[in-house]
Amino acid sequence: MSILSDTVRGVGRLFFPVRCPVCGGEMPPGSRVVCTRCRYAVPLTGFCYATYNPLWERLSALVPVEQASAFLYFIPGSGWRELIHRFKYDGAWRLARDMGVWYGHCLADSGLYDTVERIVPVPLHWRKRLRRGYNQAEYLAEGIARALRAEVDRHSVRRIRNNPAQALHRHAERWDNVEGIFAVRRPERLAGHHLLLVDDVLTTGATLLSCAETILRAAPDCRLSVAVLAVPQREFGLDG
């Protein structure tokens, strides 16, 4: 049966080759997420291996976070930007989960996230979720949870206001746009635990910080860490 399955897959690849979501090249058999060339060229930040990194410095100045990490740099016009766009807007949610697994193994290897018990994806408002069909942050969280062997908590935090997209606002207006948009409905599930707040892309950080502040107000004795998939290279890169 496995020989037949392998044959069918081989014929399928011959006529319908799997393409790398970053460069568009053909994916070699056995490749995961991206092709081998792109895997070695990923613009990693290295933040998951160091507590004192640029993202932690920015966030910890505003909220008490234990750890803060970003997996890669968001570079406009790059194939990695297109990968994120695909799982965020084009329905390729499996990409988000696979990227989460990859990211999660880096977090696990660092040893800095070993005590994380619950992973909280930044929620979407139900109207936006209904329109999109899913929340990409949940699939990222699922992938990370596999590597960290932690529980994904999708229900304790909810988005109560459907604020306009942050991209529609100037930098200063984004902070007003996120005020009071989250609520915690099950604080007892968060209290006393080490939580990992997960989102896809951080720009100003206004949305993520609003969510973090809401959690810490509802469960002040929890420990909070943050993991986002990508941050802008121009703001967080060593040469940016």
Regions found by a protein language model. Name each.
Residues M1-V198, T203-G240:
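Glycine-rich phosphate/pyrophosphate-handling loop used in enzymes and phosphotransfer proteins
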